[in-house]
Swiss-Prot record:
Keywords: Cell projection, Cilium, Coiled coil, Cytoplasm, Cytoplasmic vesicle, Cytoskeleton, Flagellum, Glycoprotein, Membrane, Ubl conjugation. GO terms for cellular component: acrosomal membrane; acrosomal vesicle; axonemal A tubule inner sheath; axonemal microtubule; cytoplasm; microtubule cytoskeleton; outer acrosomal membrane; sperm flagellum. One of its GO terms (biological process) is flagellated sperm motility. The gene is Tekt3. The lineage of its organism: Eukaryota, Metazoa, Chordata, Craniata, Vertebrata. This is Tektin-3. Microtubule inner protein component of sperm flagellar doublet microtubules. Interacts with TEKT1, TEKT2, TEKT4 and TEKT5. Interacts with CCDC38. It is found in: Cytoplasm, Cytoskeleton, Cilium axoneme; Cytoplasm, Cytoskeleton, Flagellum axoneme; Cytoplasmic vesicle, Secretory vesicle, Acrosome outer membrane. It comes from Rattus norvegicus. N- and O-glycosylated. Disulfide bonds: none annotated.
Length: 490
């Protein structure tokens, strides 16, 4: 027998090798008449499920009738009580010693059975208490583990919420800078259009004024500057769009993780507060064998940590892109305004040069007109002088012609004749000289007229240039967008 207080693995809980029957062995038919009890065949199975196993296990170890059976075999026939068929010898089967011995054996077996039962009850009670305390401790440990799990989930949930708030703020800020970039890109279309229209209008200059001057060079530089600025803005806009997509992807992962954390927190918190008396507690057979887990604590924490780190990385890249975009807008606005001012200065200088040239042309034209007038007056004077000299020539020639009609010897080559001849030559030479001067004056007048026409054409060209540069180009450039509009604030 095991000592008192042993566990359920004590020997009384396990059958020991014994006889397959709880009754004494039955001998032959002749010897059976000397036994205490008559022979009877068993009419029931010894292995039926309704019999108490503890009793029969004990009976296997301590058969109550075995001593009597063995004793009855040793009793001599002279001491045995005969049956009715042998009444002539004795009327009893056993002696008082057998009776006392049998009673003592019964008492001993009763004491042993009670002792075993008492020990079983004590061990069972202690087992119940031990298992109860063990189960309570296990449940408390599970509750504590659930509490720690709830704390872990709550911690990561707070981290996700904090990072999600930061990411939402960064996404909104990047969206704002993207909108500013789009507005700034739209605002650059007007300066580009103005510069191109200025170049187009300046193609309508005439003559020598169709020159590749400083204003045109600055206009071409302005077009290149605006196009370069637009290209940089488009590249940053594409980067902002891609970064926004990355931010929203990271934000979506955080929101999904947060939703999972909230559901897990709700479930684990409910499990933490479940008690034996709680509503909804029931049996779920085999649930402990179902392993639907997809992560371990390390991979679980790493998953959320990776999401947070990814969000932080995307947020840092977004902040860097915002800073670069902000600086780009300021640089672009300054570059465009600097080039705008250079173009305006070039236009101002060119307009001043044109105005000065126009004024000088006016002066030359005035002088030319004055000279034309004086030349015309001189021509009139020459013509009048020629006309006057023609009268002298006619008188002298008439005199000579009349003197040719003198008779005979009167045709004398006298002083008067010689003087008249000289007078004719002198007056004719004078007329020829005056006619030459008249021709020269007329040629000069033609030259002056050509100069006048040239000056008038140049004056018209300069007036057209001034109209294009001053009235058209500079008037369009008065509507250049402000710096605030170029950086996208308006």
């Amino acid at each position: 027998m095991e000592p008192l207080g042993s566990t359920l693995t004590a020997t009384y809980a396990h059958p020991q090798p014994a006889a397959t029957n709880f009754l004494p062995a039955i001998g032959t038919l002749t010897s059976s008449y000397r036994n205490r009890f008559p022979h009877r065949n068993l009419t029931h199975s010894l292995s039926l499920p309704w019999r108490p196993s503890t009793y029969y296990k004990t009976a296997y170890n301590y058969p109550t009738l075995a001593p009597l059976s063995s004793t009855s075999q040793s009793v001599c026939e002279s001491t045995m009580l005969p049956f009715v068929s042998n009444r002539t010898t004795l009327f009893t089967r056993y002696t008082p010693d057998d009776w006392y011995r049998s009673t003592l054996v019964g008492f001993q077996e009763s004491n042993c059975s009670r002792h075993n039962s008492e020990r079983l009850r004590v061990d069972t009670s202690r087992l119940i208490q031990d298992k109860y305390q063990q189960i309570r401790k296990t449940q408390a440990d599970s509750t504590q583990n659930l509490g720690e799990r709830v704390n872990d989930i709550a911690f990561w949930k707070s981290e996700i919420i904090h990072e999600l708030d930061e990411m939402i703020g960064e996404t909104n800020a990047l969206t704002d800078i993207k909108r500013r970039l789009e507005r700034g890109l739209i605002e650059t279309d007007a300066p580009l259009q103005v510069a191109r229209e200025c170049l187009f209008h300046r193609e309508k200059r005439m003559g020598i004024d169709l020159v590749h001057d400083e204003a045109e060079k600055e206009l071409l530089t302005e077009v290149e500057t605006v196009l370069c600025c637009q290209e940089r803005m488009r590249r940053h806009l594409d980067k902002a769009i891609a970064q926004l997509a990355s931010d929203r992807s990271a934000q979506h992962e955080l929101e999904k993780d947060l939703s999972d954390k909230q559901a897990a927190l709700r479930i684990d918190d409910k499990c933490k507060h479940l008690r034996n008396t709680s509503q909804g507690v029931s049996y779920f057979r085999g649930v402990e064998n179902v392993d639907a887990t997809v992560s371990v604590p390390e991979s679980w924490a790493k998953f959320t940590d990776d999401n947070v780190l990814r969000s932080q990385s995307e947020r840092a890249a977004s902040a860097k892109l915002r800073e670069d975009t902000e600086n780009l807008l300021i640089v672009i606005a300054n570059e465009m305004w600097n080039q705008f001012n250079k173009v305006n200065v070039a236009f101002t200088n060119r307009i001043a040069e044109t105005v000065d040239a126009k004024n000088k042309i006016h002066i030359h034209l005035s002088k030319t007109l004055q000279e034309i007038f004086q030349t015309e007056m001189a021509i009139e004077s020459i013509r009048k002088a020629i006309k006057e000299k023609s009268a002298f020539l006619k008188v002298a020639q008439t005199r000579l012609d009349e003197r040719t009609r003198r008779p005979n010897i009167e045709l004398c080559r006298d002083i008067a004749q010689l003087r008249l001849v000289n007078e004719v030559y002198e007056v004719d030479e004078t007329i020829q000289t005056l006619q030459q001067r008249l021709r020269d004056s007329e040629d000069t007048l033609q030259s002056l007229a050509h100069t006048k026409a040239t000056l008038e054409h140049d004056l018209a060209v300069k007036a057209n240039t001034l109209y294009i540069d001053q009235e058209k180009c500079m008037s369009m450039r008065n509507s250049y967008p402000s710096t605030l509009r170029l950086v996208g604030f308006c």
